[in-house]
Amino acid sequence: MSEDHGKDYTLEADSELRFEIEQKDAKVLVSLVSGFAELFGTELVKKKQYEFGMGAKVAIFTYQGCVLHVSGKMDVCYISKETPMVQYVNCHAALEQFRMEAEEKDRHGPVAMVVGPMDVGKSTLCRILLNYAVRVGRRPLYADLDVGQGSIAIAGSVATILIERPANVEEGFAKTAPLVYHFGHKSPSGNSILYNAVVSKMAEVTLHSLNSNKRTKSSGIIVNTCGWVKGSGYAHLLHAAKAYGACAIFVLDQERLYNELLRDVPKGVHVVLLPKSGGVVERSKELRHEARDQRIKEYFYGNARAPFYPFSFEVKFQDLRLYKIGAPPLPDSCMPIGMKAEDNKTKVVAVTPTPALIHHVLALSFAESVEDEVIGTNVAGFCCVTEVDMERQAVMLLSPQPRPLPPNALLLWSELQFMDNHT
């Protein structure tokens, strides 16, 4: 294929063009020549050119047939007629039925959870269902419980946003005014008790916020989950389903999980087994780590289309109110009377700055003091420790906002690290 002139691909009805870009600095341009096509539920505009870069794994689907013009260097590119999109649109139709009933009776709309192991396309299915909902005039909420990657905020947090318009083809959903809660670990296993507490709090606030707008109330919530589905991971899924009052659970590509949920969730919950798309690519541990890093980098620096210019400034140790949620475990014999070992998992403890703090991402909490409900308080944003100077008793912070930190700023430690080598 010539990189300069590109190639036209003719797709029949109910088929999709899939391509992947793995090479650094590679750029692929796509335009819809004729017909109708969509990317994960967002309609492509005819003759408009869309640009994709390194790491893109794209599947452009057509219900009626179309011609696409593609130019640039791809590692994989093919047309597939084997696609689960018809099943996915049926799920949307079922949710829409629930929404119409909720609208008539002035009730909360459906809460649908998407579950499955890693790399089966959970985030993509969420995006498709949200886009379809918006295209028929709904305003659903999107809750992301995947602390390993984070599609709304960065990894190590859970977050919710209101979806008012379809996702941008190249950049995804607008991340305007997200509700973000700090967890501080890359997996729920980092602190299972804290994870459940944070999920419960966000579910409570999210369900309450459905009442703020009639259209949102009947539109409901789409919930994305972690890829840990065995043992304690499965227990977290059951906890989330209960906390959100899920009425539908879409299980991607795992019959065992489907049957376990059929057995364990209340009878009124619809559990549906769905195939994953053949275009879903399994990611190595290194690729997942790179994706996490890229999300943090974009948080501070934006991207080529919309660059950000963060600030670096110094904060003295004496002005740094830094805490961590979760104290080291103690034997029961050492615990104060009436306190359980699990209580330590949600205890807020002060962190003394040391060189070990360098590169760690910190969350800026809206809580004003540790006496406040820190776990149940959302965060304003994130900063990163780029230097620790023990002689001068100061740290250097990378922040989206200029100095100083807000008065009484309370920072929360995270195990996430970011090497700021941006040039």
Curated annotation (Swiss-Prot):
This is Protein CLP1 homolog. The keyword Plastid does not apply. It comes from the Eukaryota. Belongs to the Clp1 family. Clp1 subfamily. Keywords: ATP-binding, mRNA processing, Nucleotide-binding, Nucleus. It is found in: Nucleus. One of its GO terms (molecular function) is ATP binding. ATP binds at E16, K57, D119, V120, G121, K122, S123, T124. GO terms for cellular component: mRNA cleavage factor complex; tRNA-intron endonuclease complex. Pfam families: Clp1, CLP1_N, CLP1_P. One of its GO terms (biological process) is mRNA 3'-end processing. The keyword Nucleotide-binding applies. InterPro entries: Clp1, Clp1/Grc3, Clp1_C, Clp1_C_sf, Clp1_N, Clp1_N_sf, CLP1_P, P-loop_NTPase. Required for endonucleolytic cleavage during polyadenylation-dependent pre-mRNA 3'-end formation. The gene is cbc.
